[in-house]
A protein has these predicted regions:
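Long, contiguous amphipathic alpha-helices that act as assembly "spine/axial" helices in icosahedral shell
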Residues: 122-192, 332-335
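Residue-level signal for secondary-structure boundary elements
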Residues: 69, 165-172, 176, 215-226
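Extended helix-rich, non-globular scaffold segments
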Residues: 192-200
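Extended, compositionally biased alpha-helical segments that mediate assembly or anchoring
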Residues: 1-67, 72, 265-364
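Assembly/oligomerization interface modules of large self-assembling protein complexes
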Residues: 51-136
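Extended oligomerization regions of viral-like shell subunits
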Residues: 202-318
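Short glycine-rich, low-complexity/disordered patches
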Residues: 26-30, 70-79, 173, 184-185, ...
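A structural signal for well-ordered alpha-helices, especially hydrophobic packing surfaces
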Residues: 61, 65, 111, 164, ...
Length: 364
């Protein structure tokens, strides 16, 4: 059996990196071709007299694994709701300035020149609040077994990639789809109580409501952001609006299943070929424990219509480290994922729910 094209590419990329960084790996390990045997490739790596080659292999493998995990993670269905990276600091000061109010022109108003016109400025502080690590332990036995065949080596590398990627993907997916639920529970998002969509007719009725709000959100209004709801008495209302290309729909799969694709396409003026990226279908809006039990019930939420800016998500660190433990001859690989995962009180956003939140807090 010979190595697959993908495996050849990955292994030869590792060798190229060794040449670039001047390590000894490329001096012992050959270029992999269709006719290279696993013995020719693996023997220099697992040679007990040349442990530095194995160490180089692990270091180079870490880079290949990281590249694969990074590419897959940042191409996940909800990844484009994330903002720019946040390289420094732990907090972001997010500011919104209300539109200036007009005043009538008066040719005799000389005193107005010295009058102070205060801008209405709203500020929210968002913090880095998710610092997670995903770990994989590699034993000497696993390495030896990996070099018994090309298929075993490919399975070994794929297993590491999938373990780290799946862990990060699941957490990121749940964090993103959990933001509307978190805001709903906190009284920090507008909502409307609807009839539970159980058939095509009730599902279409929901879409009609959303279509009306989709149009209204494009006009300056104080009706679709939660700033005043959260800040309470004494605060000022924010006048906000959204460009149509910035409005997205997040809908539960049970409701989406009741609708024809054309219904969503027509309702939100989206070409069928461009529905992905504007309409996000999620399994549901609940949050779950590791054993599958419900941690936070979000089953009452059926859909969300919001500006993309509602999702205040930024990655600060996404990197890999490794540690060799000679005591038990294992190698630990760590994927570090540090992020800010918050929602905005400035953004137009609305939840469509079959029940009031606890506690209740909407004027919709």
């Amino acid at each position: 059996m010979y190595p697959s094209t993908g495996l050849q590419t990955a292994l030869n990329k590792m060798r190229e990196m060794s040449v670039d960084n001047g390590s000894i790996y490329h001096q012992y390990v050959p270029v992999v071709t269709e006719s290279t045997t696993i013995g020719e490739f693996g023997q220099p790596i697992i040679d007990p007299q040349n442990v530095n080659v194995l160490n180089d292999f692990v270091g180079l493998l870490k880079k290949v694994v990281y590249t694969a995990v990074y590419s897959k993670t940042f191409n996940s269905p909800l990844a484009d709701l994330e903002g720019d990276r946040m390289p420094l600091g732990n907090f972001i000061e997010d500011v919104y300035v209300n539109p200036a109010k007009a005043r009538g022109f008066n040719v005799n108003d000389f005193a107005g020149l010295l009058q102070k016109y205060e801008a209405q400025i709203a500020t929210q502080y968002l913090a880095v609040n998710s610092d997670l690590q995903y770990c994989v332990t590699i034993t000497r036995d696993k390495i030896r077994n990996a070099f018994t065949s090309w298929s075993n080596l490919e399975a070994f590398i794929t297993g590491i990639v999938n373990s780290l990627y799946n862990g990060a993907y699941i957490t990121r997916y749940n964090q993103t789809k959990g933001l509307p639920l978190a805001a709903f529970k906190a009284g920090a998002i507008k909502y409307e109580v609807i009839t539970n969509p159980t058939d095509e007719a009730t599902a279409k009725a929901l879409v009609r409501k959303m279509r009306a709000d989709y149009t209204k959100m494009q006009v300056p209004s104080t009706a679709f952001n939660a700033w005043n709801d959260v800040k309470g008495a004494g605060s000022f209302a924010l006048n906000t609006w959204s460009d149509p290309e910035d409005l997205i729909v997040m809908i539960s799969s049970d409701v989406e299943a009741l609708l024809d694709v054309d219904v969503l396409s027509v309702a939100f003026n989206i070409d069928r070929s461009k529905l992905l990226g504007k309409i996000y279908v999620v399994s549901d809006f609940s949050q779950y424990n590791e054993d599958g039990t419900v941690a936070v019930d979000g089953s009452m939420i059926k859909a969300v219509l919001c500006d993309k800016s509602f999702f205040k998500i930024k990655t600060q660190d996404f990197d890999m480290e490794d540690f060799r433990n000679p005591n038990n001859r294992t190698i630990q690989m760590y994927l570090n994922d540090t992020r800010m995962v918050n929602y905005s009180l400035f953004a137009n956003a609305k939840v469509y729910t079959t029940a009031e939140p606890t506690p209740s807090g909407s004027d919709s």
